[in-house]
C-alpha cells in the first residue's frame, strides 16, 4: 500500500477564490484579470481557482461561447482569454504577490471535436450503436474510456504540461468521482515528483480523500437552502457538519461555500437561495473547520445570475460593498491557527439559552481561540447567554474592533440574522 498523501503546507489556512474569467471583465482576458490581483490580495485571497482555461469545442456547443467544461485541447489556452504566454504572465504575477494558482481540470469527458476524437477515437466510450456518448445527460461532451491505459497516459501527460510549463500550484478536478480512484492515485504520485500540489475534488465521496486534500460540501449547501426554506432547523445544519467530522478522515479538508459558478448560473445568487441568511451563513462557511470558497463577484455583492454559455459580465461598480466583510474573515483565517483546516484544532458547539435560534461554536488550537455566534432566525435575540466556561476571557469583535469579556454573567444581543466573530486577546 502506498504512503498517504499530505497537503502542502500553505493549504491549511488558505482562502480560495473562484475566477469566472469570461464574466470577470468586459475583455474576459488573462491580462485584464491580472489588474485585479492586488485588490484580491488585499481582501485576503490566497489561492485563485480558474475555471477551465482550455479551448472550448464548437461542435454541439451550447449558447454562443459554450461551456468551459467542453474541452477541445488539453494543452493550450482558450484564445478568447489570451495566449499561453499571457496565462504564464498571470501566474507569475500571482506568485509575485505570494498567491497560488490552481486550474480546473475536466478528466471525465471532452467536447465533441477534441483532437482525440480524430487522432485517438479509441480513447472514448461508445454506446450500443458504436457512437461517442455521455452517460450523464450533458449534450456537449463525450466520455473518455479509462479502461484504456492509453487514456490514462495521455491525461497524465496533459496535466504535467500545466505544472511544468506554467508552474501552477494545483488542480480542482471536475466531477472527480466519475474518474476511477486508482487513476487519481497514479496521477498525484507522478505529479508530486515534479512539484507538491494542492488537490481539490468536486465530489463528496469519503474514499476520494485517499488522494484529494479537499472535497466539496454539497450536502451542507443544500441543507442551508432547505434551512432558509423552513424545511429544516439548526439541528439539520449541525447534523451535516457532524457527519463531515465523524465520517471523513481527520485529515480531510472540506470546501465550504454559499455560491459558485453552478449555483449562481443555474439556481440563483446566494441571496436568491439563502435570503436574509446569506451573510450569516457566509460567516459560518468562512469559520467552520475547512476551507472557504469565495466566488467571483461575491465581494460586490453580485446579485444576478451570470449566464453560463454566453458573455454576461459582472456589473462592477467600484464600491465592493462586501470587501471589508470578507477581508476581516479571511485575514482572521490567515492569521489565527484556531481556524486551520486539518488535524490539531478543536471545534465544538457552545450551548446557549436560545439554541433553537442561535448557532454558536468555539474554534481552538493551543492558546488561540475564536468564538462565532450566529442568530439564524427572523427574530431578535436580546439576551443570549453562552453556557460554556471553557473559553471565558477577553475577546475582540473582528467586525467592530470592540473588546468584550465573556463570563458566567455576560450576555449579548443579536438582531435577526446578525453574526458576531470574536478573537481571543
Residue spans for each PLM region:
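Carbohydrate-interacting/catalytic domains
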Residues: 1-49, 55, 88-93, 238, ...
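Substrate-binding/active-site clefts of carbohydrate-active enzymes
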Residues: 3-15, 22-28, 37-46, 52-166, ...
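Hydrophobic faces of well-ordered beta-strands that scaffold small-molecule active sites
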Residues: 15-17, 48-50, 101-103, 171, ...
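Active-site beta-loop-alpha junctions enriched in small/polar residues
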Residues: 22-24, 53, 106-108, 176-178, ...
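Soluble or luminal CAZymes and related metallo-dependent hydrolases
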Residues: 29-32, 82-86, 150-155, 179, ...
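Short catalytic/ligand-binding loop motif for oxyanion handling, primarily in non-cytosolic enzymes
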Residues: 56-61, 109-114, 179-182, 207-210, ...
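Active-site-proximal helices and loops of the catalytic beta/alpha 8
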Residues: 164, 174-254, 284, 303-332, ...
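Active-site clefts of carbohydrate-active enzymes
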Residues: 250-272
